[in-house]
């Protein structure tokens, strides 16, 4: 069987900033809401299995629909900012035709669903939205209809959960609202009627969840008052109803309501079972341990998980002897500029617990072997929580660095677990945690990069020794090989001063002094609460979120001042001696490109030609040319001057360009790149066209003749959508053609082969990555080919058959693709 042209090696993502964005199925698959998609992730294998695309707005809630017999789930329900509720039928981790339920007029923020007791083809769905309504839907086979709309006036329902009354087929609905009350509805005469309002919480109710135990129904609720309340619903017998109470007896208050079912009236009582206190901030989620089947009966363990903005997650269980609910385990994150947890989940067998944080990070703990209440942090996927703006491979193709509007720079690399052949990708470091949205970056060396953000300053970072040692352990590359051409006098790590944005280097001597001071007495109270200090780590596996936040920063070695507005684009030549940078501009004087020396960090030259923002720049592989594209729909080509002595810094002069009379593109040019032989360059524009220009190897005497020589060498390729990214592989196809990847505004990535032939049909389309797993759901921001053959982290013999492509997009996602050369 032949290998597919493209397969996904990695997809990095984070979870959306909503309480109900993660749901864990009995098959061990996590459904995670990420941007406009739902990622199906296997935490055991550390791989994204599938991506469900159907929402056109942010996905705010997901829920695996549990079957009545506790068998594996096959359906998933989600709600989003596009006002839709979607039911997904999942078979073998792939989605059949999704069914959408439309009717809400505002954002859907909570969903839940149960199968009716009559048939699994009937699904009862409840959804809450910002339009102050709760809607109930019935899905029969493939048709979905709205049964009822419950209005809450001007109030909002923040969470919903539906179940069945004990010993009956009557559905009961719990709605947690912003009036600090829980509203209970019961189905009567084909309509849901309000039967009880549960008082007790003193702030917005953030989470509600039912659990059935024998003849009792328990409801767990949590709120911003930092408390958890557990309510009990049970059937009242005729004997209990007629029994008179002793006036001197002490008993919890019972709220009694009656339900008619098939001409039989039954009384039910609601009592407050317990109040759990232990969190110090708002509690956003509660989750019961999943029920399971044993000896033909359903067992519901009395274990409850809660997640709070105090950065902790607590596991609660009742004491076996007294029945008093007690805190069994408390886990959480320490340090870092974070805001706590929004949601929590049990694994199906309770061997693992998971929380997702305000900034989208997933935290996974596994129970230690043979130790009941000891939990160990585990490796889990991580990623950006806002648009990923730019990315680059390191020169040796061992890792990828990305920058995002979430104000972080992240480094992703491959990892092979000990004793396994399977390679997975993980976030290995977070070199920069900034105060401005990141925009662009360029690699200056293997362990040095320059980044630009929504500020006027370029910042240069270099890897510390601790990162290189840990990267060596994780990638199984010797430290000596990694440091072959690097400075040996490296700092150990970096830390951020309390009132600064710059990562300050920490050297070995400072760590020793710091540890000595910590052992001694403090001279003042302020010294006890000083800024977080760097702690060197010896890692053999990818770091957890706590370590990424505090111990993987890279020291800032230089700031480059010169631009008048926010940095928008940066590039570095192949020799790593010259940096080119540009900023946002609406005038010619501000659109000038500044060239910097990487040895002296001084300005070398200012190149002025364009009238509007320069969108991208690229040095030719032989360093002879600098290509610039701009919002003004033109490109300019700058040539390094010949005959300059080696001692002096290089200077560039305008070699060729287009203007308003000669430009071929009719809209903004977003992207450009060079072929590996430096003969041709490629431009991509919002006008949906890709053009190859050249031949740049032809001799020319002056700018006029050069501009005449540099002309379109290809036919105009119409991609059908705005082009936002272009990348040419440094490795040729087997037939000698150039391999060109094109990223579109709609999120699709297209692969083409092109060879200069002078004919109309010179483009050959190899593939359009428009499948749910391969494509992005929003704009492709950057594409970047690995500079060498093979797959990073692999040592198999067929490495030469593969090349790798990295992509990032406005959907917060970073993807690594394995491309099979022989199939192109």
UniProtKB/Swiss-Prot annotation:
Gene3D superfamilies: YVTN repeat-like/Quinoprotein amine dehydrogenase. One of its GO terms (biological process) is transcription elongation by RNA polymerase II. WD repeats lie at residues 14-51, 54-98, 103-147, 153-195, 200-241, 278-326, 336-375, 383-422, 433-471, 562-606, 609-648, 664-703, 718-764, 784-824. GO terms for molecular function: endopeptidase activator activity. GO terms for cellular component: cytoplasm; elongator holoenzyme complex; nucleus; proteasome complex. The keyword Nucleus applies. It is found in: Cytoplasm; Nucleus. Pathway: tRNA modification; 5-methoxycarbonylmethyl-2-thiouridine-tRNA biosynthesis. SUPFAM superfamilies: WD40 repeat-like. The keyword Lipoprotein does not apply. Keywords: Cytoplasm, Nucleus, Repeat, tRNA processing, WD repeat. SMART domains: WD40 (SM00320). Belongs to the WD repeat ELP2 family. Component of the elongator complex. Component of the elongator complex which is required for multiple tRNA modifications, including mcm5U (5-methoxycarbonylmethyl uridine), mcm5s2U (5-methoxycarbonylmethyl-2-thiouridine), and ncm5U (5-carbamoylmethyl uridine). The elongator complex catalyzes the formation of carboxymethyluridine in the wobble base at position 34 in tRNAs. Folds into a two seven-bladed beta-propeller structure which is required for elongator complex assembly. This is Elongator complex protein 2.
């Amino acid at each position: 069987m032949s290998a597919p042209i493209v397969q996904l090696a990695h997809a990095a993502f984070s979870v959306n900033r909503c309480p109900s964005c993660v749901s864990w199925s009995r098959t061990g698959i996590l459904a995670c809401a990420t941007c406009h998609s739902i990622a199906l992730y296997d935490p055991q294998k550390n791989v994204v299995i599938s991506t469900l695309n159907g929402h056109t707005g942010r996905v705010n809630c997901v829920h695996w629909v549990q079957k009545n017999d506790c068998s594996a789930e096959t359906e998933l329900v989600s709600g989003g900012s596009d006002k839709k509720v979607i039911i997904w039928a999942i078979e073998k981790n792939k989605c059949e035709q999704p069914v959408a339920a439309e009717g809400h007029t505002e954002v859907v923020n909570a969903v839940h669903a149960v199968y009716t007791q009559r048939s699994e083809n009937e699904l009862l769905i409840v959804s809450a939205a910002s339009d102050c309504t709760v809607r109930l839907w019935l899905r029969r086979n493939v048709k979905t209809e709205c049964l009822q709309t419950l209005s809450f006036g001007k109030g909002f329902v923040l969470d919903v959960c539906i179940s069945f009354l004990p010993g009956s087929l009557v559905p009961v609905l719990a709605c947690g609202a912003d009036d600090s009350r829980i509203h209970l509805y019961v189905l009567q005469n084909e309509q849901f009627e309000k039967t009880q309002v549960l008082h007790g919480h003193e702030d917005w109710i953030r989470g509600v969840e039912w659990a059935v135990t024998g003849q009792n129904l328990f409801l767990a609720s949590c709120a911003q008052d930092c408390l958890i309340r557990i309510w009990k619903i049970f059937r009242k017998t005729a004997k209990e109803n007629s029994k008179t109470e002793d006036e001197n007896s002490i008993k919890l208050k019972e709220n009694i309501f009656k339900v008619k079912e098939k001409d039989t009236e039954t009384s039910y009582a609601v009592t407050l079972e317990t109040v759990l206190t232990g969190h110090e901030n708002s509690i956003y989620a509660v989750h019961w341990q999943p029920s399971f089947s044993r000896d033909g009966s359903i067992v519901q363990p009395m274990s409850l998980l809660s997640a709070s903005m105090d950065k902790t997650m607590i596991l609660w269980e009742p004491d076996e002897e007294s029945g008093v609910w007690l805190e069994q385990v408390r886990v959480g994150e320490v340090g870092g500029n974070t805001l706590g947890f929004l949601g929590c989940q049990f694994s199906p067998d309770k061997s693992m617990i998971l929380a997702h944080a305000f900034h989208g990070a997933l935290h996974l703990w596994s129970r230690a072997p043979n130790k009941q209440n000891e939990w160990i942090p585990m490796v889990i996927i991580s990623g950006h929580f806002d648009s990923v703006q730019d990315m680059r491979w390191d020169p040796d193709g061992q890792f990828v660095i990305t920058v995002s509007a979430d104000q972080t720079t992240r480094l992703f690399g491959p990892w092979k677990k000990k004793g396994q052949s399977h390679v997975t990708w993980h976030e290995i470091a977070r070199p920069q945690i900034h105060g401005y949205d990141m925009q662009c970056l360029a690699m200056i060396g293997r362990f040095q990069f320059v980044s630009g953000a929504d500020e006027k300053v370029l910042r240069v970072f270099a890897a510390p020794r601790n990162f290189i040692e840990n990267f060596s352990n994780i990638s199984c590359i010797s430290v000596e090989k990694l440091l072959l051409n690097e400075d040996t006098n490296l700092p150990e790590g970096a830390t951020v001063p309390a009132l600064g944005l710059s990562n300050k280097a920490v050297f070995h001597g400072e760590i020793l002094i710091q540890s000595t001071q910590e052992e001694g007495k403090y001279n003042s109270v302020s010294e006890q609460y000083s800024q977080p200090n760097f702690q060197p780590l010896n890692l053999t596996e990818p770091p957890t979120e706590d370590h990424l936040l505090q111990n993987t920063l890279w020291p800032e070695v230089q700031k480059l001042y010169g631009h008048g507005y926010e940095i928008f684009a940066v590039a570095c030549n192949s020799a790593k001696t010259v940096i080119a940078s540009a900023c946002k501009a609406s005038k010619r004087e501000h659109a000038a490109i500044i060239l910097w020396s990487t040895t002296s960090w001084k300005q070398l030259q200012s190149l002025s030609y364009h009238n509007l923002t320069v969108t991208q720049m690229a040095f030719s592989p032989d360093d002879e040319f600098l290509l610039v594209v701009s919002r003004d729909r033109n490109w300019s080509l700058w040539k390094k001057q010949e005959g300059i002595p080696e001692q002096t810094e290089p200077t560039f002069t305008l070699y060729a360009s287009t203007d308003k009379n000669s430009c071929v593109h009719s809209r903004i040019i977003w992207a450009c790149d060079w072929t590996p032989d430096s003969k041709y360059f490629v431009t991509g524009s919002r006008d949906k066209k890709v053009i190859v220009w050249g031949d740049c190897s032809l001799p020319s005497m002056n700018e006029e003749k050069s501009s005449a020589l540099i002309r379109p060498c290809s036919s105009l390729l119409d991609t059908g959508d705005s082009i936002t990214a272009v990348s040419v592989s440094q490795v040729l196809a087997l037939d000698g053609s150039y391999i060109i990847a094109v990223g579109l505004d709609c999120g699709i990535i297209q692969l083409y082969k092109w060879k200069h032939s002078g004919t109309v049909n010179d483009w050959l389309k190899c593939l359009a990555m428009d499948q749910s797993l391969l494509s992005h759901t929003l704009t492709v921001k950057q594409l970047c080919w690995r500079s060498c053959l093979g797959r990073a982290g692999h040592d198999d013999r067929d490495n030469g058959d593969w090349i790798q492509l990295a992509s990032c997009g406005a959907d917060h996602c970073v993807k690594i693709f394995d491309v099979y050369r022989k199939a192109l």
